[in-house]
């Protein structure tokens, strides 16, 4: 389960950022997770519960925002919705689509005290 190492990194970044800004506690964390990122949100939540204990994020809430897949078709020049990572353009049917959203995992923001 790669979600555990991902969440360990998220907690490390969150705690270090809180310390650098003089915060004593993290109140909430919001993540953006792309639907095409191969990251399971339920597994992330499970791992979050496991790795936050004993840190300044011990009682922080976690919110996960799902980011839809989107791409730019190099053939028809349109921005299109993507349902799969290497799918065809839904407009022209060609497979020259450059992904522009939906594969990210990033910390959107956090609230500290």
From Swiss-Prot:
It comes from the Bacteria. InterPro entries: Hydgase_Ni_incorp_HypA/HybF_CS (IPR020538), HypA/HybF (IPR000688). Keywords: Metal-binding, Nickel, Zinc. Zn(2+) binds at residues 73, 76, 89, 92. GO terms for biological process: protein maturation; protein modification process. GO terms for molecular function: nickel cation binding; zinc ion binding. Ni(2+) binds at residue 2. The keyword Zinc applies. The keyword Phosphoprotein does not apply. PANTHER family: HYDROGENASE MATURATION FACTOR HYPA. Belongs to the HypA/HybF family. Involved in the maturation of [NiFe] hydrogenases. Required for nickel insertion into the metal center of the hydrogenase. This is Hydrogenase maturation factor HypA.
């Amino acid at each position: 389960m790669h979600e555990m190492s991902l969440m360990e990194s998220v907690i490390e970044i969150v705690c270090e950022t809180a310390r650098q800004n003089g915060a004593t506690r993290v109140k909430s964390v919001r993540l953006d997770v792309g639907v095409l990122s191969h990251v399971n949100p339920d597994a992330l939540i499970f791992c979050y519960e496991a790795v936050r204990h004993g840190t300044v994020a011990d009682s922080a809430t976690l919110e996960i925002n799902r980011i839809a897949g989107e791409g730019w078709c190099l053939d028809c020049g349109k921005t299109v919705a993507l349902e799969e990572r290497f799918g065809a353009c839904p407009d022209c049917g060609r497979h020259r689509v450059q992904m522009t959203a939906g594969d990210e995992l990033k910390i959107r923001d956090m609230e500290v005290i």
